[in-house]
Amino acid sequence: MIRLLFISHTGNNEPPMAQCIMDHLIQKAGLTDSLSVSAAAFAKEGAPLSKAAQETLSAHGIPYTMKKAFPIAWKTYDDYDFILLMNDKNNPDIFNTMGGDVDEKIHLLSEYAGKEADIPNPHKGGTFEDAYEEEEKACEGLLKKLEAWIR
């Protein structure tokens, strides 16, 4: 089982839409026995998806759950195979909280869409639709890579 962890934008405690998008893509590809998806945040307590995020996902036919993002802890690094950030790969909180990236598990999600940029933050000037589009492209790219390993 390959375990994926999506980490919220810095300063946001709700799970990224990417968690729901990837979960949906995994189910469509029939890979639920091979891949699992979770979400975390740098907050002490996570929050469920915002109403705007729920509406954006619904508009694209993506089911969502009301699960909260869990707070990142030191052991989080060891529990996941891929740790996917929405923004700021050089955020010191990542390394202070998880102790670094010796196994090179931490990546910007956008890398899987062929970009080196942050995913637009819908809580700080970006739109939920912009964030959805970037997250979807990146999740599709990541799934393609993972499928090649699994199959």
Feature locations, PLM:
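Phosphate-binding/catalytic loops
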Residues: 82, 88-151
